[in-house]
Amino acid sequence: MFIDLTDGQAALRDELREYFGGLLTPQEREVLVTDRQGPVYREVVRRIGRAGWLGVGWPTEYGGRGLGQMEQQIFVNEAARADVPLPGVTLQTVGPALQAHGTSEQKDFFLPRILAGEVHFAIGYTEPEAGTDLASLRTRAVLAEGGGTYLVNGEKIFTTGAHAADYIWLACRTDPGAPKHKGISILIVDTSDPGFSWTPIITHDGAHHVNATYYTDVRVPVTMRVGPENAGWRLVTTQLNHERVMLGPAGRIAALYERVLGWAASQAGPGGRPLLAQPDVQRALGRACASLHVNELLNWQVAATDTVDVADASVTKVYSAEQTQHLGQLLEEVVARHGDPADEETGQLCRWLDIQAKRNTVLTFGGGVNEIQRELIATAGLGLPRVPR
């Protein structure tokens, strides 16, 4: 069996490839190498929104083009291939969750602004004492006198993009007496509230992506609760499944493969022979090409279904995260063996590969560490018994 895109999907891919290839100025691209949350990023997202691309797969009733999840995945892959950052959490996880569980007022307010690139969310889940065991979270939300507003107190950690977000999609405990999976609610927190604050966590790429966030009597209207009170765990798991798929676009591997392939094609190897004739270069690029196509199939498998399967989401995340890291190292070694860093083209490629390697470290634990993903694959996908705790 040969599986491929339809003619219409292939045409969309080619159109998006051309669009993303010409989207950024050289100055914008240089800024976005390290600053993927700031003003340049937000302007780029607004530009994509004005072009009508952000909602390519969203239903028309919510302002999208209505083409479907496969087309939305093509959009995400092509952005990753061109190394153009997207508001993945906002567009790929919060947006679909609001479509499924939001009130009419929430949909009317947030969804058009998301598609315009005007509103950005961060996810407030992990806490210092609740990482892998997320259901142990302690951040509290208590109804204030009168019952129309929650007062939120607590802290979160590793909140990516919180310093630049307009809202936090916050998991908090609204019933401390309930079993730990039962007393959780999802609130949308406005980051302009005076009780909200953050401190930066600088990651090893030297950039500021991640934060610790603090909530001190933060006021959240009850109208900003998503879904019923104490029924937030299902929203958490649904959002995480979407996030795991978001973390695994084949475009990341495509970017690594095509960039090094293009470099190798322009280089001479020993004795003046083409560098692409070297066996180690062929092996590395062949492996990258094969992994790229496997990743594409996993993306398409998830996109072809109406709902995101737990095991399929975890498989996609584990495979893509680990292959992206492994292939990044493999291709770096090829460039290190055969390239001259003093050469301008080679030096730029070395810098880009180093930044990718550091940036992609998060992939194996963002959205849930891969060790836990393997447990989910075993239990939800293969029907094996749960690991005793």
Each model region followed by its residue ranges:
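Glycine-rich beta->alpha junctions and the first turn(s) of the following alpha-helix
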Residues: 2-7, 196-295, 363
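Amphipathic, small/basic residue-rich leader segments at the start of a protein or domain
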Residues: 1-88, 109, 113, 261, ...
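A short core secondary-structure module
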Residues: 148-199
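C-terminal helix-coil-helix/basic helical segment that borders enzyme active sites and/or dimer interfaces
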Residues: 28-35, 269-276, 293-348
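A structural signal for short hydrophobic beta-strand segments in well-ordered beta-sheet cores
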Residues: 139-143
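Glycine-rich phosphate/cofactor-binding loops in nucleotide/flavin-utilizing enzymes
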Residues: 2, 74-75, 93, 233-242, ...
